[in-house]
């Protein structure tokens, strides 16, 4: 859980947002993503959803910088970042948490966060101050000297998010955050996403657990056969007949 008495460091955001503009991608001549467009701003949680083979994963990796689109552009606060590699996108404000554990298992919790901060900040006192703040904000101060290898799934995720926030991202992209975790950890993920929004961080989630995803996002973009089938609030998505036909089924509810 997130500490309630620790004020988060708010993101200095822009009104321009993250814009996905007519992104297309083909593999071996087969179109996978077809002129997809949507945008979101800091403080919003957006779900990128769709059936298997819809193109959503390719699109997600294109936004991260792992796949280069054939056409279209990705605009971050007015700057075209389409051709930037993933590490430069990180410097510009896009954080990424993969489905797989990304924690440095050989380090303690404190040193996991310090490893990022020492790259970004030369002032050792400021490094220590921010470590203290993040440890308290995410209620992991008692785990400060605990080896990362011994953390539970929920604890590990909190450390990974705290470490990601050490680079002061404006947006965080979460890949399958609900995969392979127990109900208690699901509740923690929901709380963490809410906390990121309070911080002013924009959150983009792609996950096969559509029910959990729809209950915590503001809007969803549903991809079908490489194109946007519908974009809207969760209730709009669930109530759409085409969505039920190709993705949710008639009995789905949230």
Regions found by a protein language model. Give the residues of each.
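Conserved catalytic motifs of ABC-family nucleotide-binding domains
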Residues: 168
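Catalytic Walker B motif of ABC-type/P-loop ATPase nucleotide-binding domains
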Residues: 172-176
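The feature captures the beta-strand-to-loop junction immediately N-terminal to the Walker
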Residues: 49-51
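Conserved ABC ATPase signature
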Residues: 147-151, 155
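Conserved ABC ATPase "signature" region
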Residues: 114, 125-143, 191-194
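Helix-to-loop junction immediately C-terminal to a conserved catalytic motif
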Residues: 64
């Amino acid at each position: 859980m997130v500490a309630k008495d620790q004020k988060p460091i708010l993101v200095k955001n822009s009104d321009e947002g993250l814009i996905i503009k007519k992104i297309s991608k083909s593999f071996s001549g087969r179109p996978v993503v077809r002129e997809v467009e949507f945008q979101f701003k800091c403080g919003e949680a957006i779900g990128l959803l769709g059936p298997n083979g819809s193109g959503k994963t390719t699109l997600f990796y294109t936004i991260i910088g792992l796949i280069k689109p054939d056409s279209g552009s990705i605009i971050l606060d007015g700057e075209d970042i389409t051709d930037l590699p993933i590490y430069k996108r990180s410097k510009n404000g896009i954080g990424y948490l993969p489905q797989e554990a990304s924690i440095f298992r050989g380090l303690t919790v404190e040193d996991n966060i310090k490893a990022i901060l020492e790259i970004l900040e030369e002032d050792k006192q400021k490094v220590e101050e921010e470590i203290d703040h993040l440890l308290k904000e995410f209620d992991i101060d008692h785990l400060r000297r605990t080896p990362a290898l011994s953390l539970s799934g929920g604890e590990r995720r909190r450390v990974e998010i705290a470490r990601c926030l050490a680079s002061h991202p404006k947006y965080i992209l979460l890949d399958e955050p609900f995969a392979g975790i127990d109900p208690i950890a699901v509740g923690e993920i929901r709380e963490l996403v809410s906390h990121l929004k309070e911080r002013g961080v924009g959150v983009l989630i792609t996950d096969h657990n559509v029910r959990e995803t729809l209950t915590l996002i503001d809007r969803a973009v549903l991809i079908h056969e490489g194109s946007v089938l519908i974009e809207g609030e969760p209730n709009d998505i669930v109530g759409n007949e085409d969505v039920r036909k190709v993705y949710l089924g008639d009995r789905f509810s949230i």
